[in-house]
Amino acid sequence: MSAIVDIVGREVLDSRGNPTVECDVLLESGVMGRAAVPSGASTGSREAIELRDGDKSRYLGKGVLKAVEHINTEISEAVLGLDASEQAFLDKTLIDLDGTDNKSRLGANAMLAVSMAVARAAAEESGLPLYRYLGGMGGLQLPVPMMNVINGGAHANNSLDLQEFMIIPVGAPSFREAVRWGAEVFHALKKIINDKGMSTAVGDEGGFAPSVENHEAAIQLILQAIDAAGYTAGEQIALGLDCAASEFYKDGHYVLEGEGGIRLTAQQWTDMLATWVDKYPIISIEDGMAEGDWDGWKHLTERLGKNVQLVGDDLFVTNTRILKEGIDKDIGNSILIKINQIGTLTETFAAIEMAKRAGYTAVISHRSGETEDSTIADIAVGTNAGQIKTGSLSRSDRIAKYNQLLRIEEDLGDIAHYPGRAAFYNLR
């Protein structure tokens, strides 16, 4: 009864008004699974390829009709009749059908839409919520949210080079309370920014995007908001940064326009980050160095890797081959997990498992271009990942994930576990 009998791909829109791929999978029993894939703005060069049409007369060349056509033709022909409960076999079928190392022929967006929709259909068929279907009886842990309350870089139109300034409610007793704490800080921050005469417009991920004099000014705004909301920075709410350093790495230097255009070597940039870590309660730094600057990453890890979570996003691109190289070379201590960077659920889960075995944390993440699809919330719980990045406390495309996690926590009841600071088990 779990045989796949129909697949339909379609072009829909993401949160930036750009096309993305959605897929419906129908099983013999009559149940259906639906999934839509996200899209990034700052992307790693080694990510699986997102297939776009390139036709400038439609959506400025960003249409995805080719990817949709692949779903409705050769992917459909290859997977019709397969058992939806055999996720690994289905994903391998997609990988073999594509035949490239980076999924450039069929498109990772086409393949992921099918992979996710099949999992949703199989979960529905089994009568289990998606998180339980994906993780079995072990999925009891809610993730600690890393909430992006100030946006910069490629996600905003302001003077900040760093892409995300996040609050992390490590002291909350539950996920529900963590969300409440985050929302209250978000609203306090809005008032502070407004009272200073700055814009309260939000960026792609729902955080504010004020034009401030430098990066420390942004951090200080957040600390003021934490205090105004009645919480203690560090003890109750820690800070995290996503530098997205590849975006400002030019000719072997880190060029910070938001700091007066200074040009820093990797060592000097590490010194600046270390100064911030000493001065502020920062416990996580993502993409602190450019994806190709492995020497810089090594220096950063040696300097800060014992007391700060160093997350590789563009560095590892959810790819087990690259992650293994990083583990072998002691680069970073955490991986960001973005399902569309690799293109199938099976490969996503393999990256999470590899990270955990090596003592690295795995942070489940959205993309800046999102939809109402909340699959990553279920993945975070199903894999006991412990951490999630899904934006600020605004924009329905971000809130969809928080709301799904609230439902999951309610469903788990007394056995739900919120790890708080223990989710950062890579810190000594």
Swiss-Prot record:
Main subcellular location of this protein, as a coarse class: cytoplasm
**Which leading EC class covers this enzyme?**
lyase
For this record, the Gene Ontology CC terms, alphabetical, are:
cell surface; extracellular region; phosphopyruvate hydratase complex
EC numbers for this chain? 4.2.1.11
- Which coenzyme or cofactor does it need? Mg(2+)
* Reactions catalysed according to its record: (2R)-2-phosphoglycerate = phosphoenolpyruvate + H2O
UniProt entry keywords in alphabetical sequence: Cytoplasm, Glycolysis, Lyase, Magnesium, Metal-binding, Secreted
Q: Which biological pathway?
A: Carbohydrate degradation; glycolysis; pyruvate from D-glyceraldehyde 3-phosphate: step 4/5
Pfam families reported for this sequence: Enolase_C, Enolase_N
Q: Name one GO molecular function term.
A: magnesium ion binding
Superkingdom field = Bacteria
In terms of InterPro entries, this protein maps to: Enolase (IPR000941), Enolase-like_C_sf (IPR036849), Enolase-like_N (IPR029017), Enolase_C (IPR020810), Enolase_CS (IPR020809), Enolase_N (IPR020811)
Cofactor binding notes: Binds a second Mg(2+) ion via substrate during catalysis.
**Active site annotated at which positions?**
E205, K338
Q: Where does Mg(2+) bind?
A: D242, E286, D313
Residue numbers binding (2R)-2-phosphoglycerate: Q163, K338, R367, S368, K389
Q: Where in the cell is it found?
A: Cytoplasm; Secreted; Cell surface
Q: Which GO biological-process labels does this protein carry?
A: glycolytic process
**Purpose:** Catalyzes the reversible conversion of 2-phosphoglycerate (2-PG) into phosphoenolpyruvate (PEP). It is essential for the degradation of carbohydrates via glycolysis.
The family line of this record is: Belongs to the enolase family.
PANTHER family associated with the record: ENOLASE
Spell out the protein name for this chain: Enolase
| Biological source species | Paracidovorax citrulli (strain AAC00-1) (Acidovorax citrulli)
